[in-house]
A protein has these predicted regions:
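Membrane-embedded beta-barrel scaffold of Gram-negative outer-membrane proteins
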Residues: 286-301, 423, 429-437, 455-536, ...
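Short acidic/polar hinge/loop motifs at secondary-structure boundaries
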Residues: 107-133
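Gram-negative outer-membrane beta-barrel transporters
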Residues: 369-375, 384, 473, 479-482, ...
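Periplasmic-side early beta-strands and strand-to-turn transitions of outer-membrane beta-barrels
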Residues: 137, 149, 158-159, 165-167, ...
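N-terminal periplasmic "start-of-domain" segments of outer-membrane beta-barrel proteins
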Residues: 27-58, 85-86, 100
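Extracytoplasmic beta-strand/coil segments of soluble accessory domains associated
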Residues: 66-107
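Conserved C-terminal beta-signal and adjacent last beta-strands/turns
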Residues: 7-10, 19-20, 181-183, 193, ...
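Face-selective signature of the C-terminal outer-membrane beta-barrel domain
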Residues: 226-240, 267-400, 405-406, 410-416, ...
Length: 657
């Protein structure tokens, strides 16, 4: 298998000759902040990073963060009705939620109980940076697949500006947004915005919820004070999200009518408050400082619990030569989940214990430049503490018998990375990166755990290339990931379903390719990724890792028909996969699909824009998720389906000034 990896590497590197001449830089001078808080150009990053800008998000007609990320090489978006989308980077499968670190303006928000991506309206997004197979040194525990950084729009240095929008669509969907910004004096910038959403959704509701709409409301307030060689920024976001959901469908139900209600129904209702603060200052030519801090508060009205978390990260950058520097950083996170309802234990009501998580970490990163060669090294030491409880149920009555307080201390979580980047032309670079990434069991994992508890360790090797030749940009890489003690949920035994560590190793080998061609009025995009996830030892030795498609692809085109009139079309493909929990490959693969989205917009010179579009143009029937049940009761072991949305249409109007 190593020979196959080397062959893939030769294929990638062999393409260098075709892109080795100087050419206009189309995308490679973008500055990214996810791999380095102080910012660095994409081509000077020895890591696989993708940037989805506000322009691309708008052109493809994305309605959510999940829509914006669709089609990115190596990225699969998973979603069940009533749950936040899960961003799967490089084949994590069903545990993707805890193997990807989600940042909002550089602040981790996917900590104690996860974060609902639906609460961030796309109208608020400046860009999304996707860092794959890296980020463990800066972000630590959980950065197994990588990092997704959602960067919202900062206040603009204008006297006054604003806008509003209204959209209507299928299933009685309405979206609206309004924003206003300006500056006070020469240094203080402000903006405020509101986004709203209501919908009856694609699938039928439980009868007791007929006629009720999902809704999301989000308010943002931002301020920025300009300093000499720096700035201070403060962001506040308040959001409410109510989502009615329904459960899975059996195969016949799914085939007959995927819109019908499932085996159960209910709703989620969350209220979020997020405060982020940033201070950056260039002290002199040698020293830069960066301080970030945040507070996240979530109240679940349906489950009646409160989650809150504090975060702070100071960083200092010392420049010791041209394009050479060392960064020292420290971060601290303190989170808890408070349960407001009592629980019944053997018929007696008592207070449910709270969950707590703390982490402390220090890290150092160095970058040294020698001519066209750049070398990076990083090391992180992290300590994670958990306090939680496991629940014991009577095997006959399923009555809660006991709550056992537990704690866990992971004191020696060491992550490190090494990278080499060669700038072989004014636009092209080829890189190698090695990362050791770690993941400790989450509180959700530990509450239903079987066997010894071990830290998951991933060793990630990657070779990649980026360049721009004439009117084409290219980004490609091959990777090899070896996972030890991988954490997963095993339900192959119908009488004992638990979280546990794999008793063997999991290997993932893959390649990614992204191309964009820019003509006078036309832009063409092709993106494809391939991954082979195999269990290489232990109980499931030789089996394919569950819930991971080998192939994903996106082909798209944007055409500026005339001044102001733009058309866009995107096609998406995902190949067959085993059910998300079918680790013994008991069932056959399935659920491959091709979908097409299209939209059209016209922007007038007076600031008004009209647009319309259709998602899933050909009304393709497929599932967002496929799981299984190993029940010994009739109808026995089988796969079950969570349908994706069918065809939907929308139209809207925007005004900006």
């Amino acid at each position: 298998m190593k020979k196959k990896f080397l062959l893939l590497a030769l294929i990638v590197l062999g393409g260098m000759s075709a892109f080795a001449e100087e050419s206009p830089v189309l995308e490679l001078k973008q500055t990214v902040v996810t791999s380095d808080s102080f910012g660095t150009p994409v081509r000077e990053t020895a890591k696989n990073i993708t940037v989805i800008g506000a322009k691309e998000i708008k052109e493809k007609g994305a309605k959510t963060v999940a829509d914006a990320l669709r089609g990115v090489s190596g990225v699969v978006v998973r979603q069940m009705d009533g749950a936040s989308p899960m961003i799967d980077l490089r084949g994590s499968g069903a545990t993707a939620q805890f193997n990807t670190v989600i940042l909002l303006d550089g602040i981790p928000v996917s900590g104690l109980a996860g974060f609902d991506l639906n609460t961030v309206p796309v109208e608020e997004i400046e860009k999304i940076e996707v860092l794959q197979g890296a980020g463990a040194v800066m972000y630590g525990d959980g950065a197994i697949g990588g990092v997704v950084n959602i960067i919202t729009k900062a206040p603009t240095n204008k006297a006054v500006y604003g806008g509003a929008g209204l959209e209507v669509g299928s299933w009685r969907t309405i979206r609206e947004n309004v924003y206003l910004g300006g500056k006070i004096g020469n240094k203080f910038l402000l903006n405020a915005s509101y986004s709203g959403y209501t919908s009856e959704d694609y699938r039928d509701r439980d009868p007791k919820y007929y006629g009720r709409k999902d809704f999301r409301n989000s308010t943002w307030l931002r301020g920025k004070y300009l300093l000499d060689n720096g700035s201070i920024a403060l962001n506040y976001n308040h959001s409410e999200d109510k989502d009615y959901y329904t459960g899975y469908l059996e195969k016949k139900q799914f085939d007959d009518n995927p819109r019908q209600k499932g085996a159960w129904g209910g709703y989620t209702y969350g209220i979020n408050d997020i405060i982020n603060a940033k201070y950056n200052q260039k002290i002199n030519d040698k020293i830069d400082i960066f301080l970030t801090g945040g507070y996240y508060h979530n109240k679940s009205k349906y489950q009646n619990n409160v989650t809150k978390e504090y975060f702070i990260r100071p960083e200092v950058k010392f420049t010791y030569a041209k394009d050479s520097y060392v960064t020292l950083g420290f971060d601290y996170r303190d989170g808890r989940r408070e349960f407001k309802d009592d629980v019944l234990i053997n018929g007696i009501s008592q207070k449910a214990p709270n969950d707590k998580r703390k982490s402390f970490a220090g890290y150092v990163m160095n970058k040294s430049t020698f001519g066209n060669w750049q070398f990076t090294q990083g090391y992180r030491r992290e300590k994670v503490e958990y306090k939680y409880s496991s629940k014991v149920y009577d095997p006959m009555t399923w009555q809660l018998k006991e709550i056992k307080p537990k704690s866990a201390d992971y004191s020696n979580n060491d992550s490190f990375e090494f990278g080499v980047n060669y700038l072989y032309s004014d636009t092209g670079n080829v890189f190698f990166n090695y990362t050791r990434a770690l993941r400790t069991p989450t509180i959700q994992d530990a509450g239903a755990w079987y066997g010894p508890v071990k830290t998951q360790k991933n060793d990630i090797f990657e070779i990649g290339l980026r360049d721009a030749y004439k009117n084409t940009s290219i980004s490609t890489s091959v990777f090899y990931i070896n996972s030890k003690n991988e954490i997963y949920y095993d339900k192959t035994n119908p009488f004992s379903s638990n979280n546990q560590n794999f008793d063997g190793k999991v290997r993932r080998i893959g390649a990614q390719l992204s191309l964009a061609h820019y003509f006078d009025k036309l832009t063409l995009r092709e993106r494809v990724s391939y991954i082979v996830p195999k269990v290489t030892s232990g109980t499931y030795d030789g089996k394919e890792f569950a819930g991971v498609s080998r192939w994903t692809a996106n082909v798209g085109a944007t055409y500026n028909i005339t001044k102001g009139l733009t058309a866009n079309v995107d096609g998406y493909y995902q190949s067959n996969a085993y059910a998300e929990d079918d680790f013994d490959n008991y069932f056959s693969k399935g659920n491959n699909y091709v979908t097409v989205d299209a939209n059209l917009s016209y922007a007038f010179e007076n600031g008004i824009e009209l647009y319309t579009g259709v998602s899933n143009l050909f009304d393709k029937k497929y599932a967002n998720a496929v799981t299984s049940t190993r029940s010994t009761w009739a109808p026995g072991p089988r796969k079950v389906y969570y349908p994706a949305n069918g065809r939907s249409v929308y139209a809207g109007i925007k005004y900006t000034f």
